[in-house]
Regions:
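Flexible cytoplasmic inter-helical loops of multi-pass small-molecule transporters
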Residues: 1-18, 230-234
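Extracytoplasmic gate region of multi-pass secondary transporters
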Residues: 26-92, 181-185
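Interfacial helix-cap and linker-helix signal at transmembrane-aqueous boundaries
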Residues: 54-55, 101-102, 188-197
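Helix-to-loop junctions at the C-terminal end of transmembrane segments
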Residues: 94-106
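Cytoplasmic membrane-interface "Motif A"-like loop-to-helix N-cap segments
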Residues: 104-115
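C-terminal ends and interior cores of transmembrane alpha-helices
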Residues: 116-130
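Multi-pass alpha-helical transporter architecture, strongest
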Residues: 128, 210-234
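A membrane-interface helix-boundary motif in multi-pass transporters
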Residues: 193-211
């Protein structure tokens, strides 16, 4: 496959990471880090607990209804699957909506909308004393924002940087969040061990995740670079 003329013209010595923090690219790097870190941290912090939460919510129902151990186990397996499906379905719809919204509203307003939706959905889903069935269904609403925002990264990050550093910049900004999220399995294990079979510990933990997209929404008007209608940087 022939490389594009633009890429060939910009190829040569590989750029150093420091170039991302040069005066000409500093604002773009800051915007990319903000949206990437917010999306990755918000998604991981919720998604990591979704199957466990489904199982523990089922346990709450089983105890309330006095189900036999075999029936309780079947219910837990079904709710684990339903919790993941609800979250992922919301993410799919949210991802499909991001592109037309970004075209209509612009990139910055779209990110702000997704971040505010995510914060509100997390607060409502994990902060209110909801019945287990309602809390399970609300994972769909959480997925719309927390998971759906990822599709906006696909077109936004390349729009920020010139060809010669586009791959370096996108990879660096996106993978910073992945490095931080690598500590996630240890946190999940520790919190699950202290849950004691109740969903309360999980909900009281995850509700604090709302601070991540809320802070990003407050920073977005100054930090997120609007790229709608702009040509890709050379």
């Amino acid at each position: 496959i022939k490389e594009s003329e633009r890429w060939q013209a910009s190829s040569g010595e590989a750029p150093h990471l420091a170039v991302l923090f040069s005066p000409s690219l500093r604002a773009a790097t800051r915007a990319a880090l903000l949206v990437s870190l917010t999306a990755l941290l918000g998604w991981w912090a919720v998604n990591a607990f979704v199957p466990l939460l489904g199982s523990l919510l089922a346990g709450d129902v089983a105890r309330a209804e006095g189900l036999a151990p075999e029936a309780a186990q079947r219910l837990a397996e079904a709710w684990k699957s339903n919790a993941s499906n609800a979250f992922n379905l919301g993410g799919l719809i949210g991802a499909l909506a991001a592109i037309p919204l970004a075209k209509r509203w612009g990139r910055r307003p779209t990110f702000i909308a997704y971040f505010l939706w995510s914060a509100a959905a997390i607060l409502l889903t994990f902060g209110l004393p909801l019945p287990p069935q309602t809390r399970l269904a609300m994972l769909f609403v959480v997925g719309l924002g927390v998971y759906g925002v990822f599709s906006a990264l696909v077109f936004y990050l390349p729009e920020l940087f010139p060809t010669r550093v586009r791959g370096l910049a996108s990879g660096f900004c996106y993978n910073i969040g992945r490095v931080i999220a690598a500590f996630g399995p240890f946190a999940v294990g520790a919190i699950a061990a202290g849950a004691g079979g109740s969903s309360t510990v999980i909900t009281q933990t995850v509700v604090w995740v709302a601070a991540v997209p809320l802070l990003a929404a407050l920073l977005a008007p100054r930090w997120i670079v609007e790229t709608r209608g702009r040509s890709l940087p050379e």
